[in-house]
Amino acid sequence: MSEEVGIILREAVPGDAKDILLMMGQVNKETEFLVLDEAELLLPPETLEEELDYIYESNNNLLLLAIYEGTIIGTASVKADSQFRLSHVGEVGISILQEYWGMGLGTLMLEEIISWAKEMGVLFRLELDVQVRNERAVHLYRKMGFQIRSEERR
């Protein structure tokens, strides 16, 4: 897909902070599946820049950007716990602007995350939380080999 429509996948750097915040604000308006609180959406760019620097220098955290025509259209993240006993487990998250749903971008980004995790060799399990009613995401994760470990009810 990336070659067909000119999408670039690359790791986020501190200079991307403002554009990431804009993209996440847009995604938050487009879907009720994104679980962000007000503080995360109003995060000062300088604070996110510091976090992005930490992620970029880390070997068990990743923020991958999907960029089309200079605009961030999706993010895929892996966040590992800082506690040593849990630092081998990566929590996966994917957000895509609604205009780009159904084009295979989620698959492309998840493949890249899985490849990165194998290459780094420090994460031995990738896991995620997804709402059952988010059928697109559930389908993607099952297609990519993720298994349901538990279901929580409201």
Regions found by a protein language model. Name each.
Residues 8-22:
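A short beta-loop-alpha structural element at the N-terminal edge
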Residues 14-15, 25-28, 40-99, 110-112, ...:
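Acetyl-CoA-dependent GNAT
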Residues 32-39:
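A short, aromatic/hydrophobic, helix- or strand-capping loop or linear motif
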Residues 103-108:
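A short glycine-leucine-enriched loop at secondary-structure breakpoints
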Residues 110, 117-129:
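Conserved GNAT acetyl-CoA-binding A-motif
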Residues 141, 146:
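Conserved active-site tyrosine of GNAT-family acetyltransferases
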Residues 152-153:
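Conserved small/polar residues in nucleotide/adenosyl-binding loops
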